[in-house]
Amino acid sequence: MTQAEREQENGKEKEKEREKEKEKEKEQRGIKRPIAPPVIPEPLQEQIQSNFIVVLHPGSKTLRIGRATDTLPATVPHVIARRHKQTCQTRYEDGWLVREGLNKPESNEQRQNGLKMVDQAIWSKKMSNGVRRTPVSAEQARSYNRLIRPAGLDTSSRMKWTNTAHHPEHLVGEEALYVNPTDCYNVHWPISRGQLNVHGGVGGSLTAVLADLEAIWSHVIQKQLEIPLKDLKYYRCILLVPDIYNRHHIKELVNMLLLNMGFSAIVVHQESVCATFGSGLSSACVVDVGDQKTSLCCVEDGVSHRNSRLCLAYGGADVTRCFFWLLQRAGFPYRECQLSNRVDCILLQQLKETFCHLDQDISGLQDHEFRTRFPESPALLYQVRLGDEKLQAPMALFYPTTFGIVGQKMTSLQHRSQGDPEDPHDEHYLLGTQSKQDQSSKASAERKSLPKPPGFEGELSSQGGDPSERGGGAHGQDVELGHSQNDCLMGGAEMEEPPSALLSRKTAMTQFEGKALGLDKAILHSIDCCASDETKRKMYSSILVVGGGLLFHRAQEFLQHRILNKMPPSFRRVVESVEVITRPKDMDPRLISWKGGAVLACLDTTQEMWIHQREWQRFGVRMLRERAAFVW
C-alpha cells in the first residue's frame, strides 16, 4: 500500500470517529421525539422458584395461606381483635351468625313456610328400601329434652381466655376468637359474604378494613410461614379473588400487597378457575359453598363464563343458625346458648358438623351427647334427642326461605364497571371513542347473521368494545335489571349469544331477581346461561362442589338426585350422566381452590401474568387489564 493510500484510509477512519462523537453528543443533548403513551413492557421470562411464591386465599371466616410447595396451607380464623384507644370506649363486635333481616315481623312466618316445604320434600322422597319416611315432630323430642340436666365432668375445661395482660395492640386468629368479652377489644371480621366488610360502624371504613387484612396476613406470614416481613421483597404472591369481584377492592388489595407489604410481584386469579386447577378438571360448573356466601360459575378450559356467574348471599353460617332455631324448637338442653356469644357460635358450628346430614335413610328419634368446654367454666356433658332437625337444617340450602331472611338481596350478578380514573382505556373509553360508523356496521352485520324476534332491532347496536366479556362488569353488588342493563348480559368469553338466548335469560332473571334461589335451582340456572348446548352438556357431567358449607354425609347423592329431577327434559335425553364431584382426588373440598393457586404457580403460562412492583407503581390498575387471566 502506497503512502497516499495509507493517508486516505486514516482520513476515512478519522471521519468515522468524528461521526460517532457527533452521535454521542446528540444522545447527551437529547433529540426531540414525538410524544407517545408509555408502552407497558412485556413480562420478563425468568425461572421462578415455587417455594418463593405465597398463595393467599382469603375467605369470610377462614384464611388459607401457604407456600406453593406446601402440602397443606396454614388455616386461620379470618378475624382480628383491636385494643380500644380510649378506656371509656364502647365495645364493638362484628356479627358472625347474626345478620341483618332476621328480626323482621315476617321472619318467623317465612321460616315456618320454608320448613313446611322442607318437610314436604323429605316425605316425598322414598328411602332406599322404597318406604316413605315417617315424619318426626319436634314435640316428640322436646318432651324428652326439657327434662335433661347437664352432668359435670371430672376434668375441668382446659379452655382459657386469651391473655391480654401485656396489652397487645391487636390479636389475630384463634387468639382473637377467645378474647374475653370483658376486655377492651373490638372484634372485626374484615371479609363478609366474600367482599370487603365495609360498613358504617366502628372499623367499617375501607382504610380500616385494609389495615385489618394487612395486620392478619402479616402476622400469619411471620408466625405460621416463618417468613420475616423484610424478606417479602424476595417473594411473590398469588391472590385468589371471588368470581364476582369488586374492581376497586381488588385494586386496593394489590396495592397493599405490593406497596405496603412489599411482595415483589403478584398474580390475581378467580377462585372458580383455581378450583378446576386444583381438582384436575378442564371444565366444570364450580359450586363454592362457603361460610357466608355461595358462588356458582361455569369454567371451560381455564375461562370463567361471565353470564354463568351467580352469588347467593347464604352459606354454612346460615345453616348453623337455622340448626340452632330447630334445636330450640326441639327443647335444646343448653338453654343459655346465644347467637351473639362467640364461644357459643363455635359450639353450634361443631354440633352442625357432627350431627347434620343429607341421608334420607336415617330416620326417627336418636339420642346424642355433646360437651361444653368454655373458659373459666366447668366442662359439662349434655344428652339431647333429635329427629328430623339434623336433615332439615342442611336442606335449607335448597329452600332458603327457611333461613328467615327478610328485606335483603339474596342473589347478585356481576355488572358493568363504574370506571376508574387511573384506567383511561377502560370499557367506558372504548364505548365513547368507538365511531358511530363502526357501531352501525357491527349492528347491521349482527342483524344479517342472527335471526331476530320482532321488536329486537337496535338493541345489540348499543354494545361496544370487546364482546367477549362485556356481559357486565364490576362491583360485587346486586344487579337491578332495568333498561340500562338490558344489553349487559351478552355472551361469555367463548362466543356471543343469539338474541333469543338474551331474551330468555332476561326473562329468567326477572323471575328470581331479589328472591332467595335454592342451590339446585341456582346450579341449573348457571348452566342454562352457557351459550351452547355442548357446553351445557359438559357442565352437567362435571358439577364440582368446593368449600366447607356442604360437607354433610350423602350430600353428593342428594344433590345429584335433585339436579337429575329438575334438569330440563331435553337434556335428560342427551346427557349421559350427571356427575357431582365433592371430593376430587380424595382432597378436602375446602382446600381445592388454594391447591389450584399452588398449581397455577407452577404453570409456564403464569410467567405472562406476573405484575411486578415497579410496573404497578408506574402503570397502576392498567396492569390488571394487561396481565389478569380474566377480562378486567
Curated annotation (Swiss-Prot):
InterPro entries associated with the record: Actin, ATPase_NBD
Binding site for ATP: 288-291
Protein name: Actin-related protein 8
PANTHER family: ACTIN
Broad class of the protein's primary localization: nucleus
Gene Ontology biological-process annotations: cell division; DNA recombination; DNA repair
Subcellular location: Nucleus; Chromosome
Organism: Salmo salar
Molecular function as annotated in GO: ATP binding
Region annotated Disordered, chain positions: 1-43, 410-429, 434-494
CDD domains (UniProt xref): ASKHA_NBD_Arp8-like
Biased composition (Basic and acidic residues): 1-30
Function: Plays an important role in the functional organization of mitotic chromosomes. Exhibits low basal ATPase activity, and unable to polymerize. Proposed core component of the chromatin remodeling INO80 complex which is involved in transcriptional regulation, DNA replication and probably DNA repair. Required for the recruitment of INO80 (and probably the INO80 complex) to sites of DNA damage Strongly prefer nucleosomes and H3-H4 tetramers over H2A-H2B dimers, suggesting it may act as a nucleosome recognition module within the complex.
Keyword DNA repair (UniProt): yes
Keyword Cell membrane: no
Pfam families xref list: Actin
Keywords: ATP-binding, Cell cycle, Cell division, Chromosome, DNA damage, DNA recombination, DNA repair, Mitosis, Nucleotide-binding, Nucleus, Transcription, Transcription regulation
Quaternary structure note: Component of the chromatin remodeling INO80 complex; specifically part of a complex module associated with the DBINO domain of INO80. Exists as monomers and dimers, but the dimer is most probably the biologically relevant form required for stable interactions with histones that exploits the twofold symmetry of the nucleosome core.
Annotated Low complexity bias: 434-443
A Gene Ontology term for the protein's cellular component: chromosome
Family statement drawn from the similarity comment of this UniProt entry: Belongs to the actin family. ARP8 subfamily.
Entry superkingdom: Eukaryota
